[in-house]
Amino acid sequence: MSRLVVVSNRIAPPDNKGGAGGLAVGVLGALKAAGGLWFGWSGETGNEDEPLKKVTKGNITWASFNLSEQDYEDYYCQFSNAVLWPAFHYRLDLVQFQRPAWEGYMRVNALLADKLLPLIKENDIIWVHDYHLLPFASELRKRGVNNRIGFFLHIPFPTPEIFNALPPHDELLEQLCDFDLLGFQTENDRLAFLDSLSSQTRVTTRSGKQHIAWGKDFQTEVYPIGIEPDEIALQAAGPLPPKLAQLKAELKNVKNIFSVERLDYSKGLPERFLAYEALLENYPQHRGKIRYTQIAPTSRGEVQAYQDIRHQLETEAGRINGKYGQLGWTPLYYLNQHFDRKLLMKIFRYSDVGLVTPLRDGMNLVAKEFVAAQDPANPGVLVLSQFAGAANELTSALIVNPYDRDDVAAALNRALTMPLAERISRHAEMLDVIVKNDINRWQERFIHDLKEVTPRSPERQQQNNVATFPKLA
């Protein structure tokens, strides 16, 4: 049986007691089934030459490494998060391309390949995750690795007009073709990648999703990531902490609109605040009878764009509360702090509306978690952006354009007044999809397809080691 090697920018520590979600749950499920290695950055800066830190529990080994301060700045802060993240979320105006950062990004991917190489066994299959590691298969191929290597992109893939604006777009595209299997959240993302590829070179497609570009064979497929619906339902249904129980009792006659995500410009938070203001303005009958709570803990707080959005939200929340607030009623609660994930599941369950309106999102698991946390006999309503990957699956949500505040306001009004029978029907339809496409099915489908790939021959690999594009000067 093939061993599984998972490679990601960060690894979840084996002693992590906090409720893991998303990538960690799926990866651990796959590793437990096959046995293997999880390899990635420790999250710490220090001496890169130190030996790997290894921990083994059962049939899984965790191997982590430190990054130097310079590599952390170039690879992680300046290229991954100041170039790729904004570009892949359609925000070219926020891209800050610097050649030293690009060189650092490539340098760290090469360093990771050097560190992983001695750990790879002949029949291992390798599963690489996300935008931090786009060149990683290429670096392994240069070192003679012919194993099956798959890649899953958790964030959107932009259209050619966006992607080709990146100075190293040609190199990145060719490097991606060194993976055997490329997985995307949605069909739109998969097609955007192929469109970008076709704009740079000839692409031969066989059987729909098998391709050849630059003489390299690879496959593309869609794997929408899921959640653990049963676990979330269990967390949501447990007893309420005393403070939350008291708050629920105090607000028994108030309908609650709830949102939670990390503070990020891709999430559409300023637009969401303005849509809530439009609800209060266009549907004044709700004033004094609803409350919107937005939880948005700070992330990447050292980046100017994130500081700017935090200040903007603080200003907008104060302005809206000052304009519409009444004695005894505050219309908007904005909390810039972290909450325990299990507590959030309970808050989801007692919210009448889940408001999830990113401007662009690969999937958005919060939308799925909100549905899974509901009481099937009295569920809340999900208002969901058409630009979230989850909108392709959760078609029974109220789908909105987050750029149209009046559209979002109308959907909120509809959600707040929706009859119980319709709420139950919509929730049941969405929950059925979530259960069928849970996190375990996601990883099982990907691993199955990767195992079916024919390994690359050393002869073909030797041909592929010659890069078509020169490196950026």
UniProtKB/Swiss-Prot annotation:
Disulfide bonds: none annotated. InterPro entries: Glyco_trans_20, Trehalose_OtsA. The record marks 85, 155 as: Involved in alpha anomer selectivity. UDP-alpha-D-glucose binds at residues 21-22, 262, 267, 339, 365-369. The keyword Glycosyltransferase applies. It is an enzyme of class 2 (transferase). SUPFAM superfamilies: UDP-Glycosyltransferase/glycogen phosphorylase. Signal peptide: none annotated. One of its GO terms (molecular function) is alpha,alpha-trehalose-phosphate synthase (UDP-forming) activity. Residues 454-473 are annotated as: Disordered. Keywords: Glycosyltransferase, Transferase. It catalyses: D-glucose 6-phosphate + UDP-alpha-D-glucose = alpha,alpha-trehalose 6-phosphate + UDP + H(+). Its EC number is 2.4.1.15. D-glucose 6-phosphate binds at residues 10, 76, 130, 300. The keyword Transferase applies. Pathway: Glycan biosynthesis; trehalose biosynthesis. GO terms for biological process: trehalose biosynthetic process. NCBIfam families: PRK10117.1, trehalose_OtsA. Belongs to the glycosyltransferase 20 family. Probably involved in the osmoprotection via the biosynthesis of trehalose. Catalyzes the transfer of glucose from UDP-alpha-D-glucose (UDP-Glc) to D-glucose 6-phosphate (Glc-6-P) to form trehalose-6-phosphate. Acts with retention of the anomeric configuration of the UDP-sugar donor. Homotetramer. This is Trehalose-6-phosphate synthase. It comes from Salmonella typhimurium (strain LT2 / SGSC1412 / ATCC 700720).
